[in-house]
Amino acid sequence: MMNDGKQQSTFLFHDYETFGTHPALDRPAQFAAIRTDSEFNVIGEPEVFYCKPADDYLPQPGAVLITGITPQEARAKGENEAAFAARIHSLFTVPKTCILGYNNVRFDDEVTRNIFYRNFYDPYAWSWQHDNSRWDLLDVMRACYALRPEGINWPENDDGLPSFRLEHLTKANGIEHSNAHDAMADVYATIAMAKLVKTRQPRLFDYLFTHRNKHKLMALIDVPQMKPLVHVSGMFGAWRGNTSWVAPLAWHPENRNAVIMVDLAGDISPLLELDSDTLRERLYTAKTDLGDNAAVPVKLVHINKCPVLAQANTLRPEDADRLGINRQHCLDNLKILRENPQVREKVVAIFAEAEPFTPSDNVDAQLYNGFFSDADRAAMKIVLETEPRNLPALDITFVDKRIEKLLFNYRARNFPGTLDYAEQQRWLEHRRQVFTPEFLQGYADELQMLVQQYADDKEKVALLKALWQYAEEIV
């Protein structure tokens, strides 16, 4: 990988298969990654490995039906999560690596952060330290469809809307992807999509790659002038190609990586007519519960999450027509907003109060409760450098209340042999609180229902039976 004595930049394409959809409360099953050079030529060996589930967790049946990976298979082929985390960490922290996948910003990266959090690695540094970065090809595909669709076949789903599912895109473009939802197959498919866009739409590809960087994005955002931009985001919905013209009203009052945008294609009357309390309530009301009320056409754009933003004229008139975006309506709304600067204060007030949030007392769900201090981070590094068998004798104090609980869970899940009698009892009590009679009854009912639903599908029934056996074995 050396090149003129300097480390070359590489892409690390990766994908997780997990035992459920919740990045903090569910667990990883399999990880796959391939490193490529800047032209997407494979460097080194493909990496695939499994994670052994700990004994305080049962997989979501629906996830196992999708991936086909049973907890028994993960246990037989896998290593404990501490070792699993260490391998991923060493891949992700090679300098000048751009870590990417398909829908990773919203899913896989959250899985990574939570794995690192549970296993005493910095949850964030991998994506920025040592010239590293992250990127996500899902929004690249969405942007390509909306802004420069030529040269690529765009499949539709059953509703006649564009589909950005990896297996649909690969099929429509004649790319081999026989084993969807196998992590390695998905990684190869993602590399193939990257090559396709780079070949067919090189200027768009290079623009989006450069603008994965938050400092580059910041340069596009002009709040005082409310300068309009084109924004591509899954939040807008496939019915309009996930695209709209937006205008920046203000920076978020607390999160310096978030800018408050108005969707210019929306109905802006609520912003003019309602006060900030009413707007906040409506913003956090599900669309289905709004009734006749107009939605609040405001969204946060997080510049550290690789959002797609570009100059307004990047969306050509013919593409706006194809996507059903009314340019004149957007221009009219922009004019009204510029004439009503008081709207800025209202939207800042909406976000000045935190989003309704129920704190969890489960330490696994507390990644976002705050950053760790330097002293605690140094102490966590010592935990990693200590032989597991010496962890019980480790005499360090932590300031953050989470760390003692994390350390206990880390030992109990990965190195149960290091627990003394009192600690074994504490872990047993923890497992009793997880596997309550109500939880187990609900789990059994779900398996039963799925067995009936898939009675004719031998493979699925076998997976469900394996889950039943696994539950009986560990509970």
Curated annotation (Swiss-Prot):
Q: If you read the UniProt record, what top EC class would you report for this enzyme, in one word?
A: hydrolase
Task: Report which reactions are catalysed by this protein.
Answer: Exonucleolytic cleavage in the 3'- to 5'-direction to yield nucleoside 5'-phosphates
**Residues annotated as domain ExoI SH3-like:** 202-355
- The record's free-text note on cofactor binding: Binds 2 Mg(2+) ions per monomer.
The feature of type site (Important for interaction with ssb) is located at R148, Y207, Q311, R338
> For binding Mg(2+) 1, which residues are annotated in this chain's numbering?
D15
The site annotation (Interaction with single-stranded DNA) covers T18, I66, R113, Y124, W128, R142, F164, K214, N257, Y284, N304, Y368, F371
Q: What does this protein do?
A: Degrades single-stranded DNA (ssDNA) in a highly processive manner. Also functions as a DNA deoxyribophosphodiesterase that releases deoxyribose-phosphate moieties following the cleavage of DNA at an apurinic/apyrimidinic (AP) site by either an AP endonuclease or AP lyase.
Domain writeup = The N-terminal exonuclease domain and the exonuclease C-terminal domain form a central positively charged groove which binds the DNA.
Please state what the protein is called: Exodeoxyribonuclease I
Species source reads Escherichia coli (strain K12)
